[in-house]
């Protein structure tokens, strides 16, 4: 799969690649808004592929949602509001709540009429992929982002040590559904405390793009030294 970041510059590339029959991993998704644009880009690309008589059944794509980084960032902001009892109660809950809202959007989009028409012509859903699912805060369960992110038609690129821990003491049970009322309540509570989830996600995206650019530059430099 070609890996393309979920940025304003990336959405057009995603559609174009899919229209040309190329599998795509849309990465660095943090916010619900990014996910919506990602799914739209997928549908647009598949529509163009089908219009050109392409083979929709050969296409696979995932929407990679980064999880634990959101809790790391949100928890730091919540720690600054320690005098407010509600702040402490929200720690460690923001990332999964955000993921639940994204999954709800996924179920709505891919159960809709637009995709169902494509599905009859061989198209597969663009699966949601949970990334960055290793637990970074030792105060949380070592399998937190596995047990709390089990949902139909999703993928979890779990670190090996987390997988081993889950095999040791985890339970396979669906924990995310299309019902996201509780998740919405958590995000609303965060907003009431003056923390904007969209701003948090925007900063994480910016940081992620910079890290990707640095990795790419390092790769090019390494290749140049070999030639």
Identify the role of each PLM range.
Residues 1, 114-117, 220-223, 227:
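Long, hydrophobic, amphipathic alpha-helical segments used as structural scaffolds
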Residues 1-12:
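Active-site beta->alpha loop and helix N-cap motifs at the rims of alpha/beta catalytic domains
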Residues 10, 32-34, 206-207, 220:
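Short secondary-structure capping/turn micro-motifs that flank functional sites
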Residues 14, 22-161:
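Catalytic alpha/beta core domains of metabolic enzymes, predominantly
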Residues 17:
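Phosphate/pyrophosphate-binding loops and the adjoining catalytic core of nucleotide-dependent enzymes
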Residues 122-226:
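Flexible, acidic glycine-rich loops studded with aromatic residues
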């Amino acid at each position: 799969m070609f890996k393309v970041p979920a940025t304003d510059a990336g959405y057009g590339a995603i559609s174009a690649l899919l229209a040309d029959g190329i599998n795509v991993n849309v990465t660095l998704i943090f916010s619900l808004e990014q996910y919506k644009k990602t799914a739209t880009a997928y549908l647009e690309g598949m529509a163009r592929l089908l219009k050109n008589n392409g083979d929709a059944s050969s296409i696979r794509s995932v929407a990679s949602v980064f999880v634990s980084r959101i809790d790391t960032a949100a928890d730091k902001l919540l720690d600054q509001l320690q005098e407010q009892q509600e702040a402490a109660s929200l720690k460690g809950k923001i990332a999964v709540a955000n993921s639940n809202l994204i999954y709800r959007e996924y179920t709505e989009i891919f159960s809709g009429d637009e995709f169902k028409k494509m599905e009859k012509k061989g198209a597969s859903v663009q699966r949601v992929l949970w990334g960055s699912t290793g637990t970074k805060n030792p105060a949380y369960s070592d399998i937190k982002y596995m047990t709390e992110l089990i949902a139909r038609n999703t993928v979890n690129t779990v670190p090996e040590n987390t997988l081993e821990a889950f095999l040791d003491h985890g339970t396979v049970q669906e924990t995310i559904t299309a019902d996201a009322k509780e998740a919405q309540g958590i995000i609303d509570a965060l907003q009431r405390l003056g923390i904007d989830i969209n701003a948090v996600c925007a900063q994480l995206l910016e940081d992620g793009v910079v890290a990707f650019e640095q990795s790419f530059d390092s790769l090019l430099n390494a290749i140049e030294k070999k030639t």
